[in-house]
Amino acid sequence: MQKVVLATGNAGKVRELASLLSDFGLDIVAQTELGVDSAEETGLTFIENAILKARHAAKVTGLPAIADDSGLAVDVLGGAPGIYSARYSGEDATDQKNLQKLLETLKDVPDDQRQARFHCVLVYLRHAEDPTPLVCHGSWPGVITREPAGTGGFGYDPIFFVPSEGKTAAELTREEKSAISHRGQALKLLLDALRNG
């Protein structure tokens, strides 16, 4: 099996990708297991940051790398929190603080102007100098609610209402979410690209 470094320390992401990519002869290992520190995310887009993370992991380990960069873009806020989604409420950000800050920011915004999208970019680099990385982008439209609902998922899921499902992302089962989410879409594109060589 070809060992591939996943540019994350998130055990959940590692497990998810490892099970899906094992069929392609890829052995997914978290960068933290290989002693790789996180890359500095200096890009201004999800694509730039995913490439920075993948290139850093590939350079340090000498292995192919996969990286993910994702976040929430709210239309009325010009795409914010965007690439700053995980640290929207500041240096000591938590999911709860980020969610509360977004609800407070949108408190006077009418219901018909609360559209948002989750974005996920997955990048696969064959090596650190790969000039043609695989870049896969998934986008998931929804609406920001006024109150949290549901206990599943993480991040902004409790306030991200999915009109097609009639519930928030936090109220979806893991299987339901994976089938339609931004990350699920990006992962499907990556699997298709790997399958087709």
From Swiss-Prot:
The gene is rdgB. The active site is at D69. Coiled coil: none annotated. It comes from the Bacteria. It catalyses: XTP + H2O = XMP + diphosphate + H(+); dITP + H2O = dIMP + diphosphate + H(+); ITP + H2O = IMP + diphosphate + H(+). One of its GO terms (cellular component) is cytosol. Homodimer. Its EC number is 3.6.1.66. This is dITP/XTP pyrophosphatase. Keywords: Hydrolase, Magnesium, Metal-binding, Nucleotide metabolism, Nucleotide-binding. Belongs to the HAM1 NTPase family. One of its GO terms (molecular function) is dITP diphosphatase activity. Gene3D superfamilies: 3.90.950.10. Its cofactor is Mg(2+). One of its GO terms (biological process) is nucleotide metabolic process. The keyword Magnesium applies. Pyrophosphatase that catalyzes the hydrolysis of nucleoside triphosphates to their monophosphate derivatives, with a high preference for the non-canonical purine nucleotides XTP (xanthosine triphosphate), dITP (deoxyinosine triphosphate) and ITP. Seems to function as a house-cleaning enzyme that removes non-canonical purine nucleotides from the nucleotide pool, thus preventing their incorporation into DNA/RNA and avoiding chromosomal lesions. Pfam families: Ham1p_like. Substrate binds at T8, G9, N10, A11, G12, K13, S70, F154, G155, Y156, D157, K177, H182, R183. Binds 1 Mg(2+) ion per subunit.
